[in-house]
Amino acid sequence: MRIIFSLKNIRTLLVIVIAALVSTEGRGQGSESLPPRALMSKLKWRCVGPYIGGRVVTVTGVPGNNNLFYAGTVGGGLWKSSDGAQWENITDGQLPGTSSSIGAVAVAPSDPKILYLGTGEADIRNTVIPGNGVYRSADAGKTWQYIGLRDTHSVSAIVVDAKDPNVVYVASMGHLFAPDPNRGVFKSTDGGKSWTKTLFVDNDTGAISLVMDPNQPDVMYAAMWQAVRKPWGLSSGGPGSGIYKTTDGGANWINITRKPGLPTTVLGRVGLSVAASKPDIVYAIIQAKDGGVFRSDDAGETWNRVNQEWKLRQRAFYYMTIYADPKDPNTVYAPEVDALWVSHDGAKTFTKLRTPHGDNHIVWINPDDTNILLEGNDGGATISKDGGKTWTTEHNQPTAQFYHVNIDDQFPYHIYGAQQDEGSFEGPSSFAQGMIPFSGWHRVAYGESTYSVPQPDDPKIP
């Protein structure tokens, strides 16, 4: 006798089992039947693929170790690579709730075992996941401790004092969908045991960029961004947006937004960078009618617009970052839609470095060997050791964001999923030889997909 299984049979059986269990729940405490909650708790998750990277908005390496890297994903926690080729998640099971969305990560320059992690991304799409505060690790990411700022929601940057690992600054955009008093710059001098808000403009304005003079850690620059997200749109820019500077570790901040040479119109998002080899050189990429890339050679007192190309700021709300080479103050990187742009003449002209995926958000430049780059984009984290000529694959980090998943009636059933900026994929739920290989998955659509649904009894019909 031949028995034919179908997903419809399994669904029916599951409904009967759950119904039976539910019916026993109300029979009093003497019932020996387990409730559905206990039944479901026995199930275990397993990764089935497709092992593709998802959006990464924060990355960092470790000076002194050319093969150690960290990448924060916006839906899959923090990942670590010890060889530049393989990645492992180091926050699974340790960060509660929505903390799987990572907005910022920083390594203490004076003690690379100390890491700070800010949850909730600040690149304000309409599908962002809020975070629930800041975490600290004292053992290079093996264990994590919650250290506060639960209501910051979206952390855009973390900066650690170059000499004291317990002095740390956090830039917060706050609640992105409403005015929020938890926006601004926060400081701790005791490793996160206590916090003080050092820079606040108003409830509509958060801190989107924060950089430090590595030679004088009391000198910092902050970019404040007046922005509120709505499900149907974004309000970017206003009188709250601006650039601020402190020379006393955040005790006092000076508004330098209207210094000579900077835009005279309303500002939107701003990205900042200090040239470590010559910290009087500061770069700013500014969203404004008269915006562009600006450079100061006197620590922010005067500025010159050195570039106004639209290609560097065509999606200002999503990227708008700039990074100066730690050794060469005239080499500058600007991530953008379809490339990582690089300039070798102080941001006057830029050439394109192609990356494995578009929508580029961030780049870390190794201060010991500036040919080593770690870049984050909508397809994951990728590493170059030749100045951006070649990059590692992003198909080794299962962090892509799935909007929706579906299954068909095959046995074993197949899985269909639509991903943020990675298209839609179809793959098996099991594999006779063990782990499901990447080759077992097939891309069925490209671009920004939301649903991928087959006809249940005929998966060839989408």
Question: Which ranges hold each PLM region?
Answer:
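Beta-propeller blade termini and top-face loops
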Residues: 29-462
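Bacterial N-terminal signal peptides that target proteins for export
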Residues: 2-14
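Cleavable N-terminal signal peptides
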Residues: 15-16, 26
